[in-house]
């Protein structure tokens, strides 16, 4: 049994709760078996299971973020160690939240639109015609609200890759013309990941507000390195939790 099969047991749509295809045998897992297996996995891999359940929206992410925060505080990073305790306690929780947000992204997830800051509109300076009672009309420049063209007023946008639309593959036009049949290749924009990752420049802007004299070396060797380690830790813990679940349910 894989971790991806767990969320359906939290919102069943039919009385047939099984991880296997319908069969006459008794080897299929019931919801009681799955919940018992989850309890055993939680005792052996609590962080990995919490990360996955928080990623799919089943569980509150607070416990998972606290586990990542403890891991980040234990990291021996020279750049972070040079900071004062006050600044360090402000930066590390933000890096942890940023890494968790990057880990939680998928082709089906949505994120706040960065172009309108989640409002669905943005203010632009336009020429507006003003009409008066005397029949005169005057053109003035005013700030007006316009619908955001990226999210179409929703305030959130899909994180799926714009090149492949979340498929991971795109049509190879050159080889398609050569062979006369559709030929596909891995999307060069997302490298087959099907979604775009969070740009670390967003985290750098926040860090630079607290550390004004931030250099490129300090960013890449310190803060960006911590983000990379945190994201890697998330995937390692999830893989370990899945291995434990397979071991329990085999």
Swiss-Prot record:
Top-rank taxon, per record: Bacteria
SUPFAM superfamilies: DnaJ/Hsp40 cysteine-rich domain
Gene Ontology terms, MF aspect: DNA binding
Keyword terms, alphabetized: DNA-binding, Transcription, Transcription antitermination, Transcription regulation
GO BP, one annotated term: transcription antitermination
Family stated for the protein in its record: Belongs to the phage antitermination Q type 2 family.
PANTHER family in alphabetical order: PLASTID TRANSCRIPTIONALLY ACTIVE PROTEIN, PROTEIN SSUH2 HOMOLOG
Task performed by this protein: Positively regulate expression of some phage genes. Bacterial host RNA polymerase modified by antitermination proteins transcribes through termination sites that otherwise prevent expression of the regulated genes.
HAMAP family, per database record: Antitermination_lambda
Name the UniProt record assigns to this protein: Prophage antitermination protein Q homolog QuuQ
Organism: Escherichia coli (strain K12)
């Amino acid at each position: 049994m894989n971790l991806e099969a767990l969320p359906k047991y939290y919102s069943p749509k039919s009385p047939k709760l099984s991880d296997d295809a319908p069969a006459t045998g008794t080897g299929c897992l019931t919801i009681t078996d799955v919940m018992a297996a989850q309890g055993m996995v939680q005792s052996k891999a609590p962080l990995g299971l919490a990360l996955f359940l928080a990623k799919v929206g089943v569980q509150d992410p607070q416990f998972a973020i606290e586990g990542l925060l403890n891991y980040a505080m234990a990291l021996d990073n020279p750049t972070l160690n040079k900071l004062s305790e006050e600044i360090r306690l402000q930066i590390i929780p933000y890096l942890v939240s940023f890494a968790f947000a990057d880990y939680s992204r998928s082709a089906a997830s949505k994120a706040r639109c960065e172009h309108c800051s989640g409002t669905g509109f943005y203010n632009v300076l336009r020429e507006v015609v003003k009409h008066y009672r005397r029949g005169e009309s005057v053109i003035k420049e005013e700030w007006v609200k316009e619908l955001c063209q990226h999210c179409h007023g929703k305030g959130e946008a899909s994180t799926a890759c714009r090149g492949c639309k979340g498929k991971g593959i795109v049509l190879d036009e050159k080889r398609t013309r050569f062979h006369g049949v559709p030929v596909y290749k891995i999307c060069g924009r997302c490298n087959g990941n099907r979604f775009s990752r969070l740009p670390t420049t967003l985290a750098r802007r926040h860090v630079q507000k607290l550390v004004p004299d931030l250099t490129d070396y300090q960013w890449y060797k310190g803060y960006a390195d911590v983000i990379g380690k945190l994201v890697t830790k998330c995937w390692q813990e999830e893989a370990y939790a899945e291995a434990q679940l397979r071991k329990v349910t085999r």
